[in-house]
Design a protein with these regions (language model features):
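Carbohydrate-interacting/catalytic domains
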Residues: 91, 104, 109-128, 179-182, ...
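Substrate-binding/active-site clefts of carbohydrate-active enzymes
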Residues: 127, 137-335, 355-362, 368, ...
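Active-site clefts of carbohydrate-active enzymes
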Residues: 436-457
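Bacterial N-terminal signal peptides
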Residues: 2-14
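Structural recognition of the beta-strand scaffold that forms the well-ordered cores
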Residues: 129-133, 185-190, 218, 245-248, ...
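Immunoglobulin-like IPT/TIG beta-sandwich domains and homologous Ig-like subdomains
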Residues: 38-101
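Beta-strand/beta-sandwich contexts
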Residues: 21-54, 106-120
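Active-site-proximal helices and loops of the catalytic beta/alpha 8
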Residues: 236, 254, 327-329, 333-434, ...
Length: 627
């Protein structure tokens, strides 16, 4: 009797254990798709779900092979490598995951390759970039203004830190406006999926929302306030049809605090720190630049959380680095974008920047990536620019950096805080770069005050600042609204809605008939200088030669073997006469300096071996040379 009861008890316990063990479940697969004949092969999948302990994965088609399985301690993440035959055709290639408790299917696709002749075009000095914050540019689809789960207070145009309704469709609707302005590339701030709620914190910027896109909760998702993946693909297709390129803003450095990883990280060292215990980034870029800084002083800037609330990714963990590199390439291959702007690049390990750059260029030879190393010191920016190894032996191989140092000086010059000669003084630091022509120059930026709202900012100053930026070396970048001298103080006031992009706007600056007098003056000026740059290759790619400079004016040339264009800028409130030796440009006696149609000025003569310049007050002019 006792033996029978014992047997029954054992059977009961076994049944309970069997009932408690559950079959694996799949929540997300990253990346969800890949390509045959890709330079990354095998591709490393990260599968999120539950009950993966003891799992094995079985391909359902012979064109793919699976290896290197790794399950985290919580059995909620599964890493696996998928090798794809170069002969595999596009289609569905599901994988079976099997444990002793059951099976589940991992969805996976092989996608067709996009045409490389019309996609992945890269960016260079022939381009003019236009920065757009989708939420603040134009509302083209009212149906996504308040997505499911987004509270009313998160969607309010009266609140500068809430979602305003701008979206990808709004950008698509105004591509012809951008083409007519003359820009050639659009950079959109991140379209990653972000949390739809209202964020509360102890910082001055809370409560807020993540309308800006820099706090991803899904690296492979599109923010539902902005649209869908198909909307992004359509944007790229339509832009390419109009001769416009598209740049994606990527953020490998950090994610949002609402990312599912925060409560269940794939690996213990996926992040630097935890929500309860982490370092706040002190933004000590000087510690990164100096070879004499201690590792203890350097680590907080590399490992610290951005703004104390955006978890810092640990690219020194190989799985993290692989994940982020694949994510960058997936977006390029999936959408056909032409460039990447990499956020806060200086806070990531330099070897990771190098590996990311190499991976991009191996697969997409024309691909271009610009990094944000926000610092007023040219030595700091040059340290992150590709082309030369730093003190650590690492060449980041980064295509471009934003020229924040020159931008800050230009703003100070044209708001009368520094003498005009400061422009030339800053440009001498071009010697720090292997090739300063690869820098990306700025007219405006979404993290700073707009020019017209600076202390000392005026419409005429904004015009001179823009003329300088469009004619100096590098690839220029405008911020939406710069072309109409939009005002804007500190964040978030510098992210006002573009007038005319939203229902109920009092005027429409997308149309000449809808602009104010000030807006039209700035728009016409911007369009003319853009056209001048596009009409003359020498302005885009020629050598930069100093001719004359003092506290009030700067005259310089862009020259190549076939053409020379002279730019003369006078900040003074009074007309100014300047001379310079004709030998600076090897001009013979009698050569004529002819004002370009842009300004309509009369002919100037070279006499007595001197170039004679009569510069009107507060002016920027361009001259061509007739020998």
């Amino acid at each position: 009797m006792i033996g029978a009861l014992l047997v029954c008890a054992l059977i009961y316990v076994g049944a309970c254990e069997s009932a408690s063990a559950q079959a694996p479940t799949i929540t997300k697969v990253e990346p969800p798709s890949w390509w045959a004949a890709h330079t990354i092969n095998p591709v490393r999948l990260l599968v999120r779900g539950a009950n993966f302990r003891g799992a094995r994965v079985i391909p359902t088609r012979r064109e793919i092979q699976v290896s290197d399985l790794r399950v985290n301690d919580a059995a909620t993440y599964l890493f696996l490598s998928v090798r794809i035959s170069p002969f595999a055709r596009p289609g569905d290639y599901p994988l079976l995951i099997e444990t002793t408790s059951g099976r589940a299917t991992i969805p996976f696709k092989i996608e067709p390759q996009l045409d490389p002749s019309t996609n992945f075009q890269g960016i260079n000095a022939d381009d003019i970039i236009y920065l757009i914050m989708p939420d603040r540019f134009s509302n083209g689809d009212a149906s996504n203004d308040a997505p499911l789960g987004s509270p009313r207070e998160a969607n309010d145009r009266e609140n500068a830190r809430a979602y305003h309704g701008g979206d990808i469709r709004g950008v698509i609707n105004h591509l012809s406006y951008l083409r007519d302005l003359g820009v050639t590339a659009i950079w959109l701030t991140p379209w990653y999926d972000n949390w739809n709620g209202v964020n509360t914190c102890a910082h001055p910027w809370c409560p807020n929302t993540f309308y800006h896109g820099y706090a991803a909760i899904d690296y492979y998702g599109v923010e539902d306030h902005f649209g869908t993946l198909e909307d992004v693909r359509e944007l790229v297709r339509r832009a390419h049809q109009l001769g416009l390129k598209v740049i994606q803003d990527q953020v490998a450095n950090h994610v949002g605090s609402r990312h599912p990883w925060m409560d269940d990280p794939p690996l213990p060292d996926w992040f630097h720190g935890t929500r309860a215990s982490h370092t706040q980034n002190p933004f000590r870029g000087d510690m990164l630049l100096s070879p004499h800084a201690s590792e203890a002083d350097r680590r907080p800037t590399l490992d610290g959380w951005f703004a104390d609330e955006m978890p810092d990714m640990n690219q020194e963990e190989a799985e993290v680095a692989r994940y982020e590199i694949q994510n960058a390439l997936w977006w390029v291959g999936t959408t056909g974008i032409d460039g990447i702007r990499q956020d806060t690049i200086q806070y990531m390990p330099r070897f990771f920047i190098r590996e990311l750059s190499r991976a991009l260029h191996r697969q997409f030879q024309r691909m271009w990536m610009v990094g944000e190393a926000n610092d007023p010191d040219a030595a700091h920016v040059a340290f992150f620019m590709g082309g030369r190894a730093g003190w650590d032996g690492v060449d980041t191989e980064l295509d471009s950096d934003f020229d924040f140092p020159l931008w800050h000086v230009s703003e100070d010059v044209f708001t009368n805080k520094k003498p005009v000669r400061a422009l030339r003084d800053e440009l001498k630091y071009d010697a720090l770069y292997v090739d300063a022509t690869r820098l990306t120059t700025l007219v405006g930026n979404h993290d700073f005050r707009r020019f017209i709202s600076l202390n000392g900012g005026t419409l005429r100053g904004a015009m001179l600042h823009l003329a300088f930026t469009l004619t100096v070396r590098g690839t220029p970048q405008l911020y939406y609204g710069d072309e109409i001298a939009m005002p804007g103080a500190d964040d978030p006031d510098n992210r006002q809605d573009f007038p005319g992009g939203f229902p109920g706007d009092t005027h429409n600056a997308f149309l000449s008939s809808g602009r104010t007098g000030l807006e039209q003056r700035m728009y016409a000026w911007t369009r003319q200088w853009i056209q001048l740059r596009r009409d003359h290759t020498v302005i885009r790619k020629g050598r930069l030669i100093d001719i004359a400079f003092d506290d009030d004016a700067y005259i310089y040339a862009r020259a190549d073997d076939t053409e020379t264009i002279i730019i003369a800028i006078n900040r003074s409130l009074k007309p100014k006469k300047m001379t310079a030796p004709a030998s600076v440009l090897n001009l013979p006696e009698g050569a004529r300096l002819m004002s370009l149609p842009l300004t309509g000025r009369s002919i100037l003569l070279v006499s007595n071996h001197q170039m004679q310049f009569q510069l009107p007050a507060r002016s920027a002019e361009a001259f061509t040379i007739s020998r």
